[in-house]
Amino acid sequence: MSGPVTGGCQCGAVRFSAQALGRASICHCRMCQKAFGGFYGPLVTAHGLAWTRGRPARYASSNLVSRGFCAACGTPLTYEYDGGTELAIGALDDPERAAPVIQVNPADKLSFVDRLHALPWRQPGESPAADAFMAAVENHQHPDHDTPTWPPAKGMHP
């Protein structure tokens, strides 16, 4: 996971670059579940982190950890502790560069997580209403690459 990486929040107000990534993990602790609004927290150690647009707001989720997030759109961005910073894998422009290699805090893992892969997929055509809704969705989030300015001119979303 070496080489420079970039990423940022959903609205584009906060952007970062890291010189390299370290270990990627899935954390099942209850604090990560709440911070990510999901079943677990996907995180990767960042080396040489720099904020290239804006800066995250922070919340002290415990006596040892602060979590960075975009104050404008709420995107979770960091897990910060004495000695290191981990980035939210989903905030990377290319999350495929940070495939998790370990899971931590198994005592808090939700009981159904190991069965998610077996859930059925809704295929195109099975729900015309859902297909129509998805076709009408217009993406307003920041693209997965650095931009010189953001947001773009009114009406010029990606």
Across the structure, where does each feature detected by a protein language model lie?
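A short Gly-Trp-Pro
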Residues: M1-G8, A13-P158
